[in-house]
Amino acid sequence: MLSLRHIRRFCHFPSSAATGIAYVSTESNQIQGLKPLEEPALVKLKSERDPEKLYNLFKANATNRLVIENRFAFEDTVSRLAGAGRLDFIEDLLEHQKTLPQGRREGFIVRIIMLYGKAGMTKQALDTFFNMDLYGCKRSVKSFNAALQVLSFNPDLHTIWEFLHDAPSKYGIDIDAVSFNIAIKSFCELGILDGAYMAMREMEKSGLTPDVVTYTTLISALYKHERCVIGNGLWNLMVLKGCKPNLTTFNVRIQFLVNRRRAWDANDLLLLMPKLQVEPDSITYNMVIKGFFLARFPDMAERVYTAMHGKGYKPNLKIYQTMIHYLCKAGNFDLAYTMCKDCMRKKWYPNLDTVEMLLKGLVKKGQLDQAKSIMELVHRRVPPFRSKQLLSLKSIL
């Protein structure tokens, strides 16, 4: 049972909704020995747009394992019914599913709980957890975490704490690291950082070891709320405890360093990552490139971009956007022009402000042909820029 006496004093329960981390395990939709879903049924479920007809079609296949065990068909149906506001149809379908043989499998019930949660039907999700024994289904920490995950979508955090405090002892469930991480994420989303830290301490008192998700969640929230000293301390504690940072952790730290205009430190982390068998991604490179531009080292930003190419990475739209935008700000319109052409030929377009800045720079340098070339590519954009935007760009020429 989770002790919350230390945590509660940090909680002020604002009305904004908390968002949890999707840690909930669901069973695989790979069913051994089953043939693929027959095309006619799949096509009908996928293409049906009328909510009532969709409901009837799925209801007609309620006992067809090829349908109900297909995760996409199940979740897509519920999602579209929720989008149409037909929560009554969703409840009827899911309640019926619970009475069938699959309702005795916890993995299937976890899916039902999460589907209710994603549809905003919190009460039904909790009732599903509370009434599992009525269908002959045993509870474990997996279904507990599913219900906790759904509660983390709900603004009533009093309910979350009551559930955390009462449900484990009532149902004989030993909560795990995932349970704590969901709670910690909820605290962080609400800005209750002292409560989040105390939850981590309670985690350790319970004999559980904080993992990389725990540390990353806390470090990210601390940096976001300008509590940098504590964030740095947690980074050091994580390393001392032998918990290896993952890609997300590195990106959180690099973003913090970039925001502080510590581009060289961010670059050092980028270089350290491969040595720890953590490969940077496009987000990592984009942040370091932007960091050097912001710190007024455009040459280093270009070097990082070139090094990224050398390692086999290809720029995406965000990296193109960063490079073109800041190259223009640095007055390097020649390279910005070349990169903008490459970007647009791939059907990727920088934002309007960046294109406008590039055109003005080219015209000012007397490179009218290059500016016209960019405008030709602008006209090929799909969907096109609005007429008013196009007129604004043309006026530059």
Swiss-Prot record:
It comes from the Eukaryota. Residues 1-81 form a transit peptide. It is found in: Mitochondrion. PPR repeats lie at residues 105-139, 140-170, 176-210, 211-245, 246-280, 281-315, 316-350, 351-381. The keyword Repeat applies. One of its GO terms (cellular component) is mitochondrion. InterPro entries: Pentatricopeptide_rpt, PPR-containing_protein, TPR-like_helical_dom_sf. Pfam families: PPR, PPR_1, PPR_2. Keywords: Mitochondrion, Repeat, Transit peptide. Belongs to the PPR family. P subfamily. NCBIfam families: PPR. This is Pentatricopeptide repeat-containing protein At1g80150, mitochondrial. It comes from Arabidopsis thaliana (Mouse-ear cress).
